[in-house]
From Swiss-Prot:
Domain of life: Archaea
Signal sequence region: none
DNA-binding residue intervals: 35-54
Domain HTH cro/C1-type intervals: 24-78
Species assigned in the record: Archaeoglobus fulgidus (strain ATCC 49558 / DSM 4304 / JCM 9628 / NBRC 100126 / VC-16)
Entry keywords, A to Z: DNA-binding, Transcription, Transcription regulation
Name of the protein in its database record: Uncharacterized HTH-type transcriptional regulator AF_2414
SMART domains: HTH_XRE
Length: 229
């Protein structure tokens, strides 16, 4: 399988990160690789990986290339369990996706809600490692079953933020039938009283925090990127 676009995306994210150590740790976590697994593949000791992730060492271009290739090779040894889920997203952009970001640090649901001034309708403790902002109307009109996986970026442990929703039922039904489950679902521009009971029921069944917020979507993106990305 060809994953050059994946490698370029990961390298770019690490290089542009304000904390390269946290970025390295984040990508290792996304690929479910232990420090020992990665060290074995790179031919170095786990303590060296720890030094890079803690900031005691700064990654150069040569190390970054080896690091990313090692992650992809490890995933290949496991049948591309990680990358096969997200290749559709990486192949092209889609007009239904308004914004997408992977976080440098984990966001807890309560902290996430505070940042976007959201009200949580179902309460579950899930780690949030990114977000995708989705135009619900364009998603309904243009996304097929395979396209839906594009919404998850490089990890399903993210918040799916749906805009232009009327009751929230359609987004939650889509989540219900999908194999990948988000860490949270945000219904933008919708008052809590208008959320469909079935949407809330699905959130309870899937154990997903369901959140509503009414602040401007541009402000939401700016706040989330400033706080977590």
């Amino acid at each position: 399988m060809e994953f050059r676009s994946v490698a370029e995306r990961i390298c770019g994210d690490i290089v542009l990160s304000e904390n390269s150590g946290e970025a390295l740790r984040k990508w290792r976590s996304i690929f479910n690789a232990s420090q020992s697994d990665l060290a074995r593949k790179l031919g170095i000791s786990p303590s060296v990986i720890s030094d890079y992730e803690s900031g005691r060492r700064k990654p150069g271009t040569a190390f970054l290339k080896k690091f990313v290739c090692a992650l992809i090779e490890l995933d290949g040894e496991r049948g591309y369990q990680v990358l096969s889920k997200y290749r559709y997203f990486l192949e092209s952009d889609h007009k239904a996706v308004l914004d997408i970001a992977e976080y440098q640090k984990t966001a807890e649901p309560s902290e996430f809600c505070e940042v976007i001034e959201g009200k949580m309708l179902t309460h579950f403790d899930k780690a949030i490692h990114g977000h995708t902002v989705i135009d619900s109307i364009n998603a309904i009109l243009s996304l097929n079953a395979f396209d839906f996986y594009r919404l998850y970026g490089l990890t399903s442990e993210r918040a799916l933020i749906f805009t232009r929703v009327s009751t929230g039922r359609s987004p939650m039904v889509a989540v219900r039938v999908s194999n990948l489950k988000p860490s949270a679902v945000v219904l933008h521009g919708l008052e809590a009283e208008r959320v469909d009971e079935m949407a809330k029921k699905i959130a309870e069944i899937e154990r997903i925090p369901l959140v509503v917020t009414e602040i401007a979507i541009g402000e939401i993106v700016k706040r989330l990127r400033r706080k977590f990305a």
